[in-house]
Amino acid sequence: MTTPTFDTIEAQASYGIGLQVGQQLSESGLEGLLPEALVAGIADALEGKHPAVPVDVVHRALREIHERADAVRRQRFQAMAAEGVKYLEENAKKEGVNSTESGLQFRVINQGEGAIPARTDRVRVHYTGKLIDGTVFDSSVARGEPAEFPVNGVIPGWIEALTLMPVGSKWELTIPQELAYGERGAGASIPPFSTLVFEVELLEIL
């Protein structure tokens, strides 16, 4: 396959669309896709050609490759969910860790003396979020700017914690996947069924 040049608007836009499609497919979990065949399919569709592969064969192949991806995803995420449960069990034994009825765990790093937010309040916080392997996926501290949001506009584990924390407090939260993003995850940085660890400092009720 010859390498195209990208010296026209049309070529640059076409390449950009290809990048977007490729990124979506890369994140889909579908394995074994062949770029040459993918490009051929796009070209046939754009040029209005008769499909080179019978439609029923295409549908069968698509079904099979999706089933394979689903099986791999289930196996991977079941293991991740189990790791989260084990992490929570071990974390609950640590000194200073409190567990609520919902399964939320928190450790007080610093206890403030201010007001406690209601679900209807808007708050300003600093936070760092990690996966249980220590990978940081988001941090207002690293950005150097606190985050502001309504209490009832975040994940359930955060809502519960914020409505227990006095202003001025800094807590470490360990949030079961059921109180976080559950089976859907959140983009590429938070896989499905992830138990999450946050260090949260409640700065102000707005």
UniProtKB/Swiss-Prot annotation:
PANTHER family: FKBP-TYPE 22 KDA PEPTIDYL-PROLYL CIS-TRANS ISOMERASE, FKBP-TYPE PEPTIDYL-PROLYL CIS-TRANS ISOMERASE FKPA. Homodimer. Pfam families: FKBP_C, FKBP_N. It comes from Escherichia coli (strain K12). This is FKBP-type 22 kDa peptidyl-prolyl cis-trans isomerase. GO terms for biological process: chaperone-mediated protein folding. One of its GO terms (cellular component) is cytosol. GO terms for molecular function: FK506 binding; identical protein binding; peptidyl-prolyl cis-trans isomerase activity; protein homodimerization activity. It is an enzyme of class 5 (isomerase). PPIases accelerate the folding of proteins. Catalyzes the cis-trans isomerization of proline imidic peptide bonds in oligopeptides. Displays a preference for substrates with a lysyl residue in the P1 position. Its main location: cytoplasm. Residues 120-206 form the PPIase FKBP-type domain. It is found in: Cytoplasm; Periplasm. Keywords: Cytoplasm, Isomerase, Periplasm, Rotamase. Signal peptide: none annotated. It catalyses: [protein]-peptidylproline (omega=180) = [protein]-peptidylproline (omega=0). It comes from the Bacteria. Strongly inhibited by FK506. The keyword Cell division does not apply. Its EC number is 5.2.1.8.
